[in-house]
Amino acid sequence: MLAHPTLDKLNTMGLTGMAKAFSELISNGESEQLSHAEWLGLLLEREWSWRYDRKLAARLRFAKLRHQAVPEDVDYRSERGLDRALFMKLIGGDWIDAHDNLAICGPSGVGKSWLACALGHKACRDDRSVLYQRVPRLFANLALARGDGRYARLQRTLGHVQLLILDDWGLEPLNEQARHDLLEILEDRYGRRSTIITSQLPVSAWHEIIGNPTYADAILDRLVHNAHRIDLSGESLRRNQRRKS
């Protein structure tokens, strides 16, 4: 490694991005042609990029997104009824700033989870905290947390994350404890944070899945009242890919 007093100081101060850029610049003969302002600009840009990349990697690790999906890879040509104008607006993220929700509904295999994860990835890139949870596993984890003392901490995490993705909602009816847990989560989030929920069932069927009419009214009021809607249709994309292969 190149030895240089300035390089040592940059590393000591934890300016790793600057240190790497400095090492490259002084090893490059063309760097002598740069002005002091250009040198400083390059060093700052590399430090900013290095810190941004580290923060993004940490956010993605925390998010635990199911798919490595990004908005740039969304296929608007497939015949599934995806409104390009609406989705582009959602990519912008203003709805998250407004603490709105998003419901993505459609049959199995049309890309609901993938689209949700693409929006989650973009939110991470926009320096927002994101957490992905499959609903059946979430309720199981909450039950375990209630027994080992993690329940309050897990509820705080679910309530405070800026974008919560609840995937595979409505696969089975909710029991009494699940209804209570879900209402507590949504109560903490309503008007303060945004939630994406994906389901094979149309929103009109969610009341029945929740079961208890009082809970159903309270849950849906907090979940659907301020929700954008994406209703997908068509054949399973996974099935079509298997046919092509």
Swiss-Prot record:
Source superkingdom: Bacteria
Protein residues bound to ATP: G106, P107, S108, G109, V110, G111, K112, S113
Pfam family name, one: IstB_IS21
Gene Ontology biological process terms from the UniProt entry: DNA replication
Record InterPro entries: AAA+_ATPase, DNAC/IstB-like, IstB, IstB_ATP-bd, P-loop_NTPase
Molecular functions (GO terms): ATP binding; ATP hydrolysis activity
Keywords assigned by UniProt, alphabetized: ATP-binding, Nucleotide-binding, Plasmid, Transposable element
Homology family: Belongs to the IS21/IS1162 putative ATP-binding protein family.
Protein name: Putative insertion sequence ATP-binding protein y4pL
Species whose genome carries this gene: Sinorhizobium fredii (strain NBRC 101917 / NGR234)
Lineage of source species: Bacteria, Pseudomonadati, Pseudomonadota, Alphaproteobacteria, Hyphomicrobiales
